[in-house]
């Protein structure tokens, strides 16, 4: 969710030199933003000693601004090691207190989006970030694949998996949904290698219009495929956020989490968020990230009828 903010920073503040600390894997997400220097977080940096070594690399850069968009224990320790006393520092306010009140039912109004929170972190250092200035990523030509799509094909991406069960539509519901789709549509199903990939193969069931997007594609290739979609149907997970970078309509299926927590994909209409029946599950959301979900809310997502998703899809396509 930091990508749009970094993109606007680059385009509206061209004189600022940007060094981004991230993993090699996630650096791919920024590949349409020019003139970014990367400092990679490696497995060896997970230890106390490793963080100290990483801080020495940052100190050599001698930054004027240090901006922590993660605000977790490791970044707090890392900041302690940074010796540049002349650097201005800002740390994202994740709104943890507000989110606790939200899941306790004390607050019901939508919270500030994380995109906005990241932008405000820069603005605390008088670096203006207007998210309306974000330019969507350009469509990427699909190469190195075994699928042939015509320009008339409707491409629908489905990302049916999530890290936690309470955020994941059941396999039976996904099967029923896919079987209800127009047979002329090309259905591209995304998932991680291993168990998820095996489930995708089952979902595809040797149908010519169903395609496995998993270990056969790296992240850069998957982004190229996503950029060509007409719509993405996603759980509360990363694929929806990636699709939103390309200006693609994203239908998000929510379970124990909720879009009011501020983690929805960029620039999507409220109607694109499909949530369980709040009359049956009045305490939603009961978790922010999907962990520590009450047992009686784990299956809330599976009370969402396929017809509701199809109705929204029909209005988009």
Regions found by a protein language model. Give the residues of each.
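Catalytic machinery of carbohydrate-active enzymes
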Residues: 1-317
């Amino acid at each position: 969710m930091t990508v749009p903010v970094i993109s606007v920073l680059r385009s509206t503040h061209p004189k600022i030199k940007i060094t981004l600390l991230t993993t090699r894997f996630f650096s791919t997400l920024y590949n349409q933003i020019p003139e970014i220097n990367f400092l990679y977080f490696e497995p060896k940096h997970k230890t106390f000693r490793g963080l100290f070594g990483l801080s020495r690399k940052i100190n050599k850069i001698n930054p004027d601004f240090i901006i922590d968009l993660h605000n977790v224990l490791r970044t707090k320790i890392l900041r302690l090691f940074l010796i540049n006393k002349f650097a201005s520092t800002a740390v994202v306010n994740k709104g943890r207190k507000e989110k606790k009140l939200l899941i306790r039912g004390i607050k019901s109004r939508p919270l500030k989006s994380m995109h906005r929170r990241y932008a405000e972190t820069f603005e605390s250092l008088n670096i203006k970030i207007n998210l309306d200035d974000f330019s969507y990523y350009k469509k990427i030509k699909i190469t190195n694949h075994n699928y042939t799509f015509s320009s008339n094909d409707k491409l629908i991406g489905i990302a049916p998996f999530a890290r936690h069960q309470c955020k994941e539509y059941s396999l039976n519901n996904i099967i029923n949904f896919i079987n209800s789709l127009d047979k002329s549509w090309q259905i591209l199903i995304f998932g991680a290698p291993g168990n998820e990939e095996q489930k995708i193969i089952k979902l595809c069931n040797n149908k010519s219009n169903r395609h496995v997007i998993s270990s056969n594609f790296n992240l850069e290739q998957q982004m190229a495929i996503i950029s060509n979609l007409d719509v993405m149907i996603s759980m509360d997970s990363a694929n929806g956020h990636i699709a939103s970078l390309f200006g693609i309509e994203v239908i998000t299926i929510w379970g124990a989490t909720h879009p009011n927590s501020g983690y929805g994909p960029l620039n999507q209409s409220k109607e694109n968020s499909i949530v369980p029946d709040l009359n049956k599950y009045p305490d939603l959301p009961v978790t922010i990230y999907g962990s520590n979900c009450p047992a009686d809310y784990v299956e809330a997502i599976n009370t969402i009828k396929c017809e509701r998703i199809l109705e929204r899809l029909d209005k988009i396509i």
